[in-house]
Swiss-Prot record:
GO (cellular component) term, any one: cytosol
Key word Isomerase present: yes
UniProt-annotated catalytic positions: 109 (proton acceptor)
Catalytic activity as recorded in UniProt: aldehydo-D-ribose 5-phosphate = D-ribulose 5-phosphate
Gene behind the chain: rpiA
CDD domains cross-referenced by the UniProt entry: RPI_A (cd01398)
Name recorded for this polypeptide: Ribose-5-phosphate isomerase A
Any one of the GO BP annotations: D-ribose metabolic process
Length: 232
């Protein structure tokens, strides 16, 4: 699948997911290449159809994009609930376990998600896998002592790599932390790994989102299809 085909599937999933946002709602808006298409469609509906809703974003990038369309964006602490959060995912399996954080927004994404009545992910078909872990697992760590955390990860066989930008500088999250990517290839026991990571001093959050999502809208060549989590 080339990039143009992949983008077409992402766009189709984003447009389908935008239908979930209705007048008067408080909607969580995620981060990433697929969410960009979602926000474009919500912006179009706001400007052309008069859709009025309030957004809570998981990154400053998404906030800037939404506000460029005139969409009202507020801080998460200024709302008492979020009706639905729509976000992307880097991988998702049949048990609705996912990896997120390829865009370095995993902490804000998880905070918004855990305060939402409904969580929806939008992905293209390449993101649906049998076993998660092929995509490097992002872990957000504070800069102080980050090298020590990386050594611990190396000792556990997690194959950590500090994420750098195109200039060779450390990638910084919106909270000014570092991102360490774990090249695990496959994750057979995600719950155990999640507990190990979050109990490591210096780790702020990890990109494992386990059985959190309610629906996954998959961009498919035959049209968007919906995976529904029966355990939620």
């Amino acid at each position: 699948m080339d990039k143009a085909q992949q983008d077409a599937l992402k766009k189709a999933a984003g447009i389908e997911a935008a239908k979930l946002v209705e007048n008067g709602m408080i909607a969580g808006l995620g981060t990433g290449s697929t969410v960009k298409f979602l926000v474009d469609e919500l912006g179009r509906r706001h400007q052309e159809e008069g859709l009025e809703f309030t957004g809570v974003t998981t990154s400053r990038r998404t906030q800037a994009q939404a506000e460029s369309y005139g969409i009202k964006i507020v801080d998460i602490d200024d709302v008492d609930h979020i009706d639905v959060t729509i976000d992307g995912a880097d991988e998702v399996d049949k048990n609705f376990n996912g990896i997120k954080g390829g865009g370095a927004a995993l902490l804000w994404e998880k905070i918004v998600a855990t305060n939402s009545n409904q969580i929806v992910w939008i992905v293209d078909e390449s993101k649906v896998v049998d076993t998660i872990g092929k995509f490097p697992l992002p872990v957000e760590v504070i800069p102080f002592g980050a090298g020590q955390v990386i050594k611990k990860f190396e000792a556990r066989g997690y194959k950590p790599v500090l994420r750098l930008d195109a200039d060779g500088k450390e990638v910084r999250t919106d909270e000014n932390n570092f991102v360490v990517d774990l090249h695990l290839e496959r994750i057979d026991h995600p719950q155990e790994l999640a507990e190990d990571l979050i109990n490591t001093v210096g780790v702020v959050e990890h990109g494992l989102f386990l059985n959190m999502v309610d629906k996954v809208i998959v961009g498919d060549p035959n049209g968007p299809r919906v995976m529904t989590n029966a355990n939620k």
